[in-house]
A protein has these predicted regions:
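Helix-rich terminal scaffold detector
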Residues: 1-71, 161-165
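Generic secondary-structure transition motif, activating predominantly at the C-termini of alpha-helices
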Residues: 40-43, 76, 135
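Non-DNA-binding regulatory cores of transcription-related proteins
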Residues: 82-146, 150-151
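Short, compositionally biased
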Residues: 111, 153-165
């Protein structure tokens, strides 16, 4: 019998699960709050998709919600107020100067919080790894595809010493 006359399943093809993170899920307190807010928003989207009987959307949203809930459950909150003040660690805001004299500010955060456009980089990024443990005045090499870039650490700040976010 030809497939032309057989009924296709109304159930969408199963989506593969989203892969869990390969590294510990370190987050700032604000990062955990963001994950929880995203989870709550996703639950609302899922309820709306269920109400309109959108099977494909329900499947995708349920998968994403399982992944997000696992990220929340696995979160390891690092309180920046307890970090060492004299060297770069998780939740530090670091002021650096490159070889051309340009000054940039980077904040080291969890994978789910990272947004290079706003100056937040993941703790597992090459930049954060290069800065980890550095002190004011230290020069580090930031490995980049275009070649390593030397950076001088000008300042290190942590949450209790920053202006309000």
């Amino acid at each position: 019998m030809s497939r032309a006359f057989t009924r296709e399943s109304d159930t969408p093809e199963a989506l593969p699960e989203r892969a869990p993170g390969a590294h510990p899920n370190y987050v700032t307190p604000a990062g955990l709050a963001q994950l929880r807010a995203r989870s709550a928003a996703l639950r609302q989207e899922l309820a709306a998709a269920q109400a309109r009987a959108d099977a494909a959307a329900v499947q995708a949203l349920a998968r994403d919600l399982r992944w997000l809930d696992a990220r929340v459950a696995d979160a390891i909150v690092i309180d920046g107020t307890t970090q060492p003040r004299d060297r770069v660690a998780f939740d530090a805001e670091v002021e650096v100067e490159d070889a051309c004299g340009a000054v940039r500010h980077w904040r080291i955060v969890g994978e789910d919080e990272a947004d290079a456009g706003s100056g937040s980089v993941s703790w597992i990024s090459p930049l954060a790894r290069a800065l980890a443990g550095a002190r004011v005045g230290d020069e580090v090499l930031w490995p980049r595809p275009a070649g390593a870039q030397p950076l001088t650490v000008l300042a290190i700040r942590y949450p209790d010493a920053r202006t309000p976010r």
